[in-house]
Amino acid sequence: MTIDHRSTGGSTTGGSTTGGSTTGRSFGEEGGRLTYGSYLRVPELLAQQIPQVVPPAHDELLFITVHQAYELWFQQLLHELTAVRDAMTTTQLWRARQLLRRAHVIERLLVSQIDVLETMTPQDFLEFRAALAPASGFQSVQFRELEFLSGAKDPGFLARFRSLTPAERRRLDGRLAEPSLWDAYLGLLASRGLPAGDDEQVLAALVEVARDRGRHDDLWQLAEDLLTHDELSGLWRARHVQMVERQIGTKSGTGGSTGAPYLHRRVPMRYYPLLWELRDWL
């Protein structure tokens, strides 16, 4: 007697009986297709943390992991903020606001990551700090891209940073040449018939936006989201310099900068000073 298993809805082969499957394969092994590890390239990812000091220093792995995580999040922020700018350029303000709010969450996460670094004592850091020279956070190309995209364009950085690869220089040149978030916002003001020339005109336009919420509430809300981006960036810089002082005091940076004094000078920088000045006129 021959049994047609297709009619039973089950299995007599010892494999899974769920849904009538007779494959005998485990979850995630459907014919060698994509898996969690292969999709995320986990083996390759975990091979990128390569401590430098001998004998090993326990906290060097933590230091590498945190900074690599920063670079991954910088990549994501560039992805989101570029899309924010493009959405403003095409007057999709709802989309720009949605992605800016996502960027805010990521930026708060970046501030909180400093707490992880501060679990490392100054003595722990000194076990491997000398091996970092002449590398420096100053050399983070993606961090500079974020500043340029946000509106703080500094062509002099390319001259000061002599170890840029050709690909890195092309990326930074591209960010300097393309419109910033602020450029895109000024374009929105102009599209509403508001003056967007010199700073005095822009400030007058912003005052009108703030005072006529009935007509311009979408522009007001978007400006507030840009200001939050500016505020969170400043919060990260302030938190970062505190962490540096806690670790190394006023020593020079590994890349040759003045260290904490240089970082202190960067803290007051604002991407959108006119949005801050606007408060004086409300």
Task: Name every feature range the model reports, one short phrase each.
Residues 11-18:
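Short, low-complexity S/T/E/D/G/P-rich linear segments that nucleate or cap local secondary structure
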Residues 2-8, 20-282:
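Surface-exposed peri-terminal alpha-helical interaction modules
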